[in-house]
Swiss-Prot record:
Activated by phosphorylation. It comes from Methanococcus maripaludis (strain C5 / ATCC BAA-1333). Mg(2+) binds at residues 88, 231, 233, 235. This is Phosphoglucosamine mutase. It catalyses: alpha-D-glucosamine 1-phosphate = D-glucosamine 6-phosphate. Catalyzes the conversion of glucosamine-6-phosphate to glucosamine-1-phosphate.
């Protein structure tokens, strides 16, 4: 049975028996674990089940309660591994399990496959009375994380910030840490509720409408509030500028990459194959290299360690600040957006408006999982003929041009093939998208 996807285990109505087996499998190779959970109603259930498996296999467990993923990832340094019970931005009926190494990086596919093999092949014998693990409760994890982050910040301006936590795990950290950083904070959806009563945890324009309206109302009196909004486990963030605009993920990432290079003198940054070419355009001016990797925080973290770059980010709002820690951190990212504003002495909307605007198009096409490889093989061969270019196959199939690019990639969690296009001219973007869609459909049909 395949359990792990592109971001750990994530399922609708996650079975506690699966959680138990995961815990028992972990105990085969790890004897000291720290575990946390987000606000989902099934969090206690899944945590209890995975803890039972760990204990049965002789693994000692420290529970740190309801915390964001960055707190869990930071805490993992004192243990053999960290276990986060979360389904991130998914609706409340979902839950999941994401595993972290001591250095804060998420488990890679090889590590997950090893666990999967144990789960699928082990007989799950009962532990003996003299080899059962123990449980310890630690209530200092949030405090320790917050103190560490604040020690590494450089913010002198008292910013006005609306913090939207989605009734999720960010509630226990974000409002307080922004306040301690000197901000005047207005909290929205900041009480923990695993039903996500205020909004769904995906921080997109549709879900953030009420928060946008609040910011527009506040700024009608020239108060210059910006917004920071999280997903379900606060490993991501998106910003809302003073004009009440939910910032474009690509533009915010490009602006921040430029800031990192200008402030630190960094000679490279890491991003993914689906990130905007605005990043390349921005950083070429400073002679900095853009290193692209597969989509996903695991790949970004691996490349950061390999290249020594201090920052890596995805255009989903998943950013890793290697100079602080290697876990994706939406709380730290939000605070560093404020650092960027202070560095430039500009409002957020002014910084974002300086980023080049390109034509972006996205489509997803239904495709049975068993046909995905057939489609990608066809796209690679046919695309090379049509575009007269060798395909880039780091993650999916990408063709790059002077004025744009197209990426065709199978979804790792759904029965779709995704087509992403970016171009400097609208006509070229539409032409690329039309060609991409046609290739995918032909690949599905097998003709």
């Amino acid at each position: 049975m395949k359990l792990f996807g592109t971001s750990g285990i994530r399922m609708k109505n996650l079975d506690p028996l699966i959680a138990y087996k995961v815990g028992y499998a972990i105990s085969k190779n790890f004897k000291k674990a720290v575990i946390g959970r987000d606000t989902r109603t099934t969090g206690n259930l899944i945590e209890s089940a995975i803890t039972a498996g760990l204990l049965n296999g002789g693994c000692d467990v420290t529970t740190i309660g309801m915390v964001p993923t960055p707190v869990l990832g930071y805490s993992a340094k004192d243990y053999d591994l960290g276990i986060m019970i979360t389904a991130s931005h998914n609706p409340p009926e979902y839950n999941g399990i994401k595993l972290f190494n001591k250095n804060g990086t998420a488990f890679d596919p090889k590590q997950e496959k090893e666990l999967e093999n144990i789960i699928n092949n082990d007989d799950f014998n009962e532990g003996t009375w003299d080899n059962i693990g123990c449980v310890i409760e630690d209530k200092t994890a949030v405090k320790n994380y917050s103190e560490y982050i604040l020690q590494n910040l450089d913010i002198k301006t008292n910013f006005n910030v609306v913090v939207d936590c989605a009734n999720a795990a960010g509630c226990v950290v974000s409002p307080n840490i922004f306040t301690e950083a000197g901000c005047k904070v207005i909290s929205v959806n900041s009480h923990c509720d695993g039903r996500f009563v205020g909004r769904m945890p995906e921080p997109n324009e549709k879900n953030l409408k009420e928060t946008v309206d609040i910011i527009k109302g506040l700024n009608s009196n020239c108060r210059n509030y910006i917004g920071i909004a999280h997903d379900g486990d606060a490993d991501r963030m998106i910003a809302i500028d003073e004009l009440g605009r939910v910032t474009d993920f690509d533009k915010l990432l490009a602006a921040f990459c430029k800031y990192i290079v200008q402030k630190t003198g960094a000679d490279k940054i890491v991003t993914t194959v689906d990130a905007s070419m605005a990043i390349d355009e921005y950083l070429n001016e400073f002679g900095a290299e853009v290193v692209r990797t597969k989509i996903g925080d695991v790949a970004v973290a691996e490349e950061l360690e390999k290249t020594g770059a201090i920052f890596g980010g995805e255009p989903s709002g998943t950013w890793i600040h290697r100079d602080i820690h290697l876990t994706p951190d939406g709380i730290l990212s939000g605070l560093r957006v404020l650092e960027m504003m202070e560095f430039y002495d500009k409002k957020l909307h002014e910084i974002i408006d300086e980023v080049p605007s390109y034509y972006n198009m996205r489509e997803k096409i239904l495709c049975p999982d068993n046909l995905k490889q057939q489609v990608m093989d066809y796209v690679s061969k046919e695309g090379e003929k049509i575009f007269e270019k060798k395909p880039e196959t780091l993650d999916g199939v990408r063709f790059s041009f002077e004025k744009g690019w197209i990426l065709i990639r199978p979804s790792g969690t759904e029965s779709y093939v995704r087509v992403r296009v970016e171009a400097k001219e609208k006509d070229f973007a539409e032409k690329l998208m039309k060609t991409g869609i046609s290739m995918v459909y032909t690949g599905i049909s097998g003709n």
